[in-house]
């Protein structure tokens, strides 16, 4: 993929001292999510802090995905990447979407950016629960996100706890549409899809647009605890006021956090500098990416399936965040 110059990103405040004379320049390739998405903007802001503090650093930011980023780190194609905690757990265990454990990965920081699973049906579908789909063998027409996406995987994990598979849905006469979220939203608007699924932070613009045209219902996840234990998701809740009150009531679901992972063979000094830039430049980062405001140094070092990089651990311990 084409590497994008960080000089195009918003200029941020200089932090830290210049790199000492004689030290090796920092050279990094960073993989985020889609261009202009939350992780792309947030990781871009962190990379800009590094280039500001170390003018001779060579840092490139490229788009990526939850599934491809761990493999790129294992293959030494990238040095640091954004990753959801639940997919990191799959990488550690070697479970779907991976065929075996993914190596050469350590954690840098848990950003604790909340991404909740939206399971949304048209109100006129008559569907009120996931249990009802199983009991009545409803021929569900569902858009669970692109094939292999974290949205589809999380949705499948939830369905499996209810004793439902995608093959079951097809056997009952339903259809699985792995179109992009915009297409599926349009299909739901036209009555071609009963359910739209999305895992992400806040209110997705396409769901906001859909809710303005079609009455919707968010289905609760009652099997959240079982899913959490297996896949390192957590039990979350949508406030009733979301989507201009269309949510109607607080609705239980599952969610995941965003984290930063790095190569295991990254030098301790580089991992230390990345952690320092993130922690000491926090205000600059969240100015560029408000969704990362959940990040705090006090909690950044735990809650991740991969062990912490020794360089990051050194910073957290030096500053007293980690005892």
Language model regions located:
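Pocket-lining segment of extracytoplasmic ligand-binding domains
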Residues: 85-87, 95-97, 103, 125, ...
